Amino acid sequence: MIPRTLFSSEHELFRDSVRTFLEKEAVPFHGEWEKQGYIDRQLWSKAGEAGMLCSHIPEEYGGLGADFLYSAVVIEEIGRLGLTGIGFSLHSDIVAPYILHYGSESLKHKYLPRLVSGEMVTAIAMTEPGAGSDLQGVKTTAVLDGDEYVINGSKTFITNGYLADLVIVVAKTDPKAGAKGTSLFLVEADTPGFSKGKRLEKVGMKAQDTSELFFQDVRVPKENLLGQAGAGFAYLMQELPQERLTVAIGGLASAEAALQWTLEYTRERKAFGRAIADFQNSRFKLAE
């Protein structure tokens, strides 16, 4: 790894504890998790106890009040160990900020401590069978009926969807208003009418549960609306840059790990009486 000055000694101490935790609690089991299609639920509560979830959440809501670099450390160590099934970052760095930034005080106190502890696993339901990167095209609707919103629609390719206890649902509260008709809602998994479809098989990241979600006349209190009705698209645009950053951090860490594993292999693998790393063509390829 290229030496960096970005992280303090405290960050590096945290890194050591994260790596130790993952090597004990995740690495030995990841192969089995890939077969079953999701990680064991107890890993979440153990990670919460270890301070690895939502470390940036303020202390008043149960977090450590730490900076984003602590999240970056967790993402990097997961990537370097090849633990592609662990969806901590989506939970901590994507879902939690929506609640922190746009949720009422009541919602923050109700949910954030449970996210920090790992009692609740979270997901965000944006993608639909007919709407992916075009979030203005979502068809899921939320209609106000008295003191409740009634949600109908379906979502797909939802990371953490199978284990999720709480989901942020992107829905249209005014289908005719375009981007200004989109809103965000918190929906608990045991809400009547909310069901989970099959876990989707993927080419890679097989231990990361990815599911379909269905909403049929799902009623949620209007207090579960995040922020203002119709402002959901703006909130998504505000928060998505951090999501992209977490993907970049994880991708770079995984690439560094892949290079390191390749170097180790080429030094150990012998051909024609010497390590294949000593062959000129191998060196050219590794240099590239």
Predicted regions and their residues:
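Glycine-rich beta->alpha junctions and the first turn(s) of the following alpha-helix
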Residues: P3-E10, F14, F194-E288
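Structural signature of FAD isoalloxazine-binding scaffolds in flavoprotein oxidoreductases
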Residues: G65-E77, D134-V138, E188, F214, ...
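A short, Trp-centered hydrophobic/proline-enriched beta-strand micro-motif
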Residues: G118-M126, V170
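A short core secondary-structure module
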Residues: D147-E148, N152-G197
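Short Gly/Pro-enriched turn/cap motifs at secondary-structure boundaries
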Residues: F88, L115, G130-S133, F157-N160, ...
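A structural signal for short hydrophobic beta-strand segments in well-ordered beta-sheet cores
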Residues: T140-V143
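Amphipathic, small/basic residue-rich leader segments at the start of a protein or domain
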Residues: M1-S89, H109-K110, R114-S117, V121, ...
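N-terminal glycine-rich flavin-associated loop
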Residues: I86-S106, G132
